[in-house]
Amino acid sequence: MSTSSFVHLHIHTEFSLADSTIRVPEKPEQAHPKKAKQANLLSRAVELGLPALAVTDLNNLFALIKFYKAAETVGIKPISGADLLIAEPEHTPWGMTLLCRDHAGYLNLSQLISRGWLEGHRPEGGVAVHPDWVRDHHKNLFALIGRHSLAGQLFAKGRADLAEQQLADWQHVFGNGLHLELTRTGRDGEEPFNQFALQVAGIRGIPVIASNDVRFLVPSDFLAHEARVCIASGRMLDDPKRPRTYSEQQYLRSSEEMAALFTDIPDALDNTRTLAQRCNIEMRLGTYFLPNYPVPNDETLDSWIRKQSHEGLEARLLKHPLAPGQTREDYVTRLEFELDTIIKMGFSGYFLIVADFIQWGKQQGIPIGPGRGSGAGSLVAWTLLITDLDPLPYNLLFERFLNPERVSMPDFDIDFCMERRDEVISYVARKYGRERVSQIITYGTMAAKAVVRDVGRVLGFPYGLVDSIAKLIPNTLGITLKDAMGEGETNDNASAELIQRYQAEEDVQELLNLARQLEDLTRNAGKHAGGVVIAPNPLTEFCPLFAEHDENGRGKNPVTQFDKNDVEEVGLVKFDFLGLRTLTIIDWAVKAINKRHARACIDPVDITALPLDDIPTYKDIFASGNTSAVFQFESSGMRRLLKDARPDRFEDLIALVSLYRPGPMDLIPEFTARKHGVQETIYPDPRTKNILKDTYGIMVYQEQVMQMAQIVGGYSLGSADLLRRAMGKKVPAEMAKHREIFREGAAKGGMDAVKADEIFDLMEKFAGYGFNKSHAAAYALVSYQTAWLKRHYPAEFMAATLSSDMDNTDKVVGFLDEARNLNLKVLRPNINHSVYMFEATHADTIQYGLGAIKGVGQSVCEAIVKERLHYGPYTSLLNFCTRVASAKLNRRALEAMIHAGALDELGKNRASVMLQLPEVIKATEQMSRERESGQNPLFGNADPSTPAIQLDLPECEEWPLTRMLNGERETLGLYFSGHPFDPYRKQVKELVGCDLNTSALERILGSQQRGNGEKRTWHPEVNTILAGLVVSVRRKGDSQVFVQLEDGRGRIECSAFSDALAEFGHLLTRDRILIVKGGLREDEFNDGYSLRIRQCWDYTQLCTDYAQRLLLRVDLRTSDAWERIDAILARYRPGNTPLRLDLLLNSTHGPVAGTLDLSGAQSVRIEQSLLDKLQKDPAVSTLKVKYTPPWVQ
């Protein structure tokens, strides 16, 4: 510490979540002022020359590790502490600041804070600790008591005697560790309390300390701080009733400013330094503490992993063939090498722990992925059943996972079925103790759009203004306001309209300036998606815990207060329990298949034992790009790539997964050309052929870079991994050193320096975007499994896929389209046949799931199915309502099922069932009341499937088709019985020439797509004409409108900007048949296609304005045929479209044909209703309208 006489001991940071704008650097180097992206606590402290700091966030230690590391980086002494809210029944909750004397004090504070979150939830929100808990955990802690304490409250009420007694009580607890906090920040009541505190200090010998109760860095941050407080409390800045708790003086003052402020109380300044010197917490970072894995008494961890691995290898090789070119001895040699490395590095326990919970999960039938990340390159992992991919056939490297030349924790990422992942976490908690197992915290931040909306609200700006500004911020993941304002490293995400409005409007300037001060501050705490820690001792010996609360105010689902990086810093080992929905889909599909197989006495499918050379899977799924719903291969770009690459072996799938990313994507045309012999495969050196042959001489994987370094440069694989990492970081000095080592190694193999440099440069280029082959291989296996299921069991696979996304209407619509493309019949929801999920009822049939109906919950569906299975099908609406509990089957759910068609079997038609509903509900409610009261005259029938009461229920004609279809769309998210576009389809197609289905759009773009030899990273627009029904309209500010068109065969999003919007905006409304002309292109963001509108027309109006002639072929040989046709035509006169009638008439010589042209007063208006009426008349055999459309004039 420097000789400065003052130290700030009471500072809230952004991690107090509600009342501070002080940022804590995410990385230690950002503590340096020149390296900080924005001013933060440490960078400002360095500028002020502060010797030490204490972070004392409210009820948490979230920031501790980040603060500790950053402070040490810049030579500032870190002091750990926290503000605790203390509650007891007879008093308003009050505050006390605790500082850690040492590591023992940290453990006590950790336990105290954890107890608050687990036991101290308050009904009004937040948490507090009981004074007795502080007394239980006070050792090695210093306490600061100030104006916000209970003593301060009592003094403010005129009870100085009780206030002094309070201080005496806490002095008895903390002894010379108690300090009285004095503040001079311009807030009411400060100076009287200071005088009282000085008086008590003199009487009782309690030291006083000066404090600025810091909440922001500089005075100009006060408004942003107040805005943050208002955001957290739901108030507006100009609300006269909101509490003004803070002042503009609560900034990080310099030592000189504090000295001037407390010139009359120098001891208060000196005591901060003295107390800071007494605080000497030393966090033990970087040492790992593995949980204790139990092994048999006569075994050690090391001997047990050897035994289990060798036994596992024998079991694996009984079922799996040896890798080509490998012997059993090769496997044993590789296994021993890996075991020696694991044991030497002290990670036997880690592997055994992971193997244990994965094996338990598999024994319970929980779907678990074959591997993820570099861990799939370990043979030991394969023998212990951690992974399901033999690494030897695919040349996967152990050193990429665990490098003996670089000591770091191994890190297995494990994919579990989404539905059952928590079962495995519960097993781990039971095995090692719930107090030793926890998930990990994650912090939410104030993102760009959200902070603009929040700031707009607290400023009291009109919603329309704020909403319009928020919508101008691009929908790019991780975008900042700086990016949107065109001030980022590139202008890729700049919004021209946002910039223009910022420059032109004062309100927008105020809004965005304030929002930028708050953007990216930590906002809330949540739970990490998959991270779990297992400790050898109770977790509070390593870090405090945070918890939500249940309805009784008890903490539930505790998580560590340190995030995934910081828990590892304090020595806790993180295990990633990740949820992968694809595993759930595979599991559901396989169970459905095997259920059908069991009925037919066919052997069950074992998805883990599929042959990886199934020709139909490669030919019909991968090579044809038929990969919608196939894991990792479903995007339109990938489907197009597959058609070019035509993969026919598993190694191709691994390569394509790795290549289809920014950077290596440019290599795809060359890869494809070499695969199919269009280009010659060339190797950098003959010795590299075995390394690069599977990728046709192109470096695709990180492992290939490592093997090149080994074979050509003489590196060990461990050193080669260090080289790969260095190449990825591109540090010039490091690269120069490695280049020389590589040259020397290459020279020993007879290679000159020029050739060595050429290969080194090639490796350096590819190392930057080479992919982890172990991860690609493991995920390619999951991809293959889904493709195999789709090819051989499409109904079960698509039913599982649909079920996995039942609550996502857009995805359901797309998957239903794909099911129909596979020639599968999809039956409407039906209470007498459907279950909760989609179900394959036959090899070519899927029954719609009841759970996919909006407004119908899972419990309702399960009750319907359970009752049906016990007592048989439902026979009427009354029968249905009386048999299913009314508490679950409410009117809203019933109406939704009627509109969805699920009750079609229960009445004459949907309109009749809806008409009967009120009377049936009334009757069933009466029956329910009488049953509950013991009067049960209606339930004399022993068979619950047949209600004793009979009602005379009305019937009516069916709804018009449009109403039926709209009801389906409202409840299912799609039109099921048809499509409103159907009546227009024939005429529209004659006009525009194609549907909106994906294959048609692909054909339009096909001529513009790149060939095998052409490299292109952009996708051109193709001018085209399309048509469809407008089903949704979305506006973005005043300058952009997005409409979605559907035609029952497909859908597309169309956008209109500036000039087009000004001219055609009035046509962009729902339920209109719209013809659009514009630029069609691939939409990679939404994985589909989009069209930029340049012109558009209302189809109905176009029919009237541009129909040149109506052609009819009419049979007039029946007596009243002409009268009917003429009567129809008469209703559409006068009009502008002449007619040509090809007539078939009777004559004395038999049937004769003639032609009649009608024009002038006989011309008609072309409307869809006219065409419908004519087509329905039996005398009309042919109808055609000739148009001269405006786009060809």
From Swiss-Prot:
EC code(s) of this entry: 2.7.7.7
Principal EC category: transferase
Tagged with keyword Translocase: no
GO BP terms, alphabetized: DNA replication
Name by which UniProt lists this protein: DNA polymerase III subunit alpha
Keyword entries, A-Z: Cytoplasm, DNA replication, DNA-directed DNA polymerase, Nucleotidyltransferase, Transferase
Function in brief: DNA polymerase III is a complex, multichain enzyme responsible for most of the replicative synthesis in bacteria. This DNA polymerase also exhibits 3' to 5' exonuclease activity. The alpha chain is the DNA polymerase.
Family matches, as InterPro entries: DNA_pol3_alpha_NTPase_dom (IPR011708), DNA_pol3_alpha_thumb_dom (IPR041931), DNA_pol3_finger (IPR040982), DnaE2/DnaE/PolC (IPR004805), DNAPol_HHH (IPR029460), NA-bd_OB-fold (IPR012340), NA-bd_OB_tRNA (IPR004365), PHP_dom (IPR004013)
Protein family (similarity comment): Belongs to the DNA polymerase type-C family. DnaE subfamily.
GO cellular component terms listed in the entry, alphabetical order: cytoplasm
Top-level division of the source organism's lineage: Bacteria
Subcellular location: Cytoplasm
GO molecular function: 3'-5' exonuclease activity; DNA-directed DNA polymerase activity; nucleic acid binding
Catalytic activity of the protein: DNA(n) + a 2'-deoxyribonucleoside 5'-triphosphate = DNA(n+1) + diphosphate
Subunit structure: DNA polymerase III contains a core (composed of alpha, epsilon and theta chains) that associates with a tau subunit. This core dimerizes to form the PolIII' complex. PolIII' associates with the gamma complex (composed of gamma, delta, delta', psi and chi chains) and with the beta chain to form the complete DNA polymerase III complex.
